[in-house]
Amino acid sequence: MVSVQKVPAIALCSGVSLALLHFLCLAACLNESPGQNSKDEKLCPENFTRILDSLLDGYDNRLRPGFGGPVTEVKTDIYVTSFGPVSDVEMEYTMDVFFRQTWIDKRLKYDGPIEILRLNNMMVTKVWTPDTFFRNGKKSVSHNMTAPNKLFRIMRNGTILYTMRLTISAECPMRLVDFPMDGHACPLKFGSYAYPKSEMIYTWTKGPEKSVEVPKESSSLVQYDLIGQTVSSETIKSITGEYIVMTVYFHLRRKMGYFMIQTYIPCIMTVILSQVSFWINKESVPARTVFGITTVLTMTTLSISARHSLPKVSYATAMDWFIAVCFAFVFSALIEFAAVNYFTNIQMQKAKKKISKPPPEVPAAPVLKEKHTETSLQNTHANLNMRKRTNALVHSESDVKSRTEVGNHSSKTSAVQESSEATPKAHLASSPNPFSRANAAETMSAAARGLSSAASPSPHGTLRPASLGSASTRPAFGSRLGRIKTTVNTTGAAGNVSATPPPPAPPPSGSGTSKIDKYARILFPVTFGAFNMVYWVVYLSKDTMEKSESLM
């Protein structure tokens, strides 16, 4: 009996010991640290190979995740590393981005010691990836230096992160009506090329506000300021189905500095220069013509150069309107001078015609003419009587002559002749009356002949010199000659006063300032200043930023 009872007790003790041993082993396994596991995994890379091989075993990368079942959701976000430049002529912009896509592929689930499998670009070609393309992209380049810039990660639950670095040149439709005070919303549109929204849709990873990041240092724009960006999504219908399109709008506002220096200030200075001609004398035709032609050619050059930085649009921009108005002011200044010159010439021609017309006849004119004729006849009779008296005086003096030496008489005779000839000639040259000049000349010549006859030889061959040097005859003869000169001068002066018409009035010189110039000096600057005020107030206060909805 005793031996039978001892055997079950020993068996019970051995069972308890075994159970306690198993419990201690299990506790030791549970207390093992993860670091030791990871260390073991590093030491055993064949574990990763085994996991990847198991994932790709029977995997078909031609089929999307959940094929024939639920819709595949692709989450996206964009990080901009460089934005710019923007081309107005080509209407496009360029930027470098990190384009990230995330989706879930349950076929790539795995159970292993590592949370994330960080793989290179070689794995990309072995699994399914979204067929994303940029709808408004003109040229997109994936960087491959020094290796393809792609990132691929697989998580335990089958979530996949696919990132690549791209340089995208996208189209940016621009409405340049308000150029250069304009703003634009340049879109970036992307979506699936083959899968409609019934099979694949796109969403933003971090929501609409934070899914697109553009750091300030990434902007490399010269003519624009990057104000911000907005995101949206839309559905586009086509013959192959409806597709989800994701859109990012980059809002740009143009800088005015370049165009102020290059176009606006030169145009304003050219208009002011054209108005300087209003202050130049209207007789200075070459100077004013040079001002007008030079300013017109300058405005033409400015208008051509301003269009070089723009596409060949069919509508007028804000700068085109400003240049057109400035050109109109410059051209009007040239036309204003042409009008001034034309009306000045007309006034001078009218004044010359008035001067060339004979003065109206006065009723007393015939009476004056008759009086002038009578006066001329009286002067003629007086000159004849005076000539007779002179001849009588010469003959009486020749009878009272004394005998002198022949040499002295000859010299005195020549002196008298020279004086008698010079006196009437000088008087004739200064006398304006033809009647008085003729009568005086005859009288003086007769007196000279009388003196010469006094010295002529006698019939007996002897000379009869006149004694001009006697004291009795010299004063009488001199006084008579003086009276003759006085009478001739008086007669000639009277005839001159009655016969000579008054001198004509000088023609108008046309000097002075034209009334057109006076008005233009005030009208042109005031009008141009008012235009500038309205122009700048309207465009600077106007919201010229394009709305995102207008581009959709």
From Swiss-Prot:
Composition skew (Basic and acidic residues), residue ranges: 396-406
Superkingdom, natural source: Eukaryota
Keyword Glycoprotein: yes
Residue numbers spanned by region Disordered: 353-480, 492-513
Stretches that traverse the bilayer: 260-280, 285-305, 319-341, 516-538
UniProt catalytic activity: chloride(in) = chloride(out)
Endpoints of the signal sequence: 1-35
Record GO cellular component, one term: GABA-A receptor complex
Protein name, entry field: Gamma-aminobutyric acid receptor subunit alpha-4
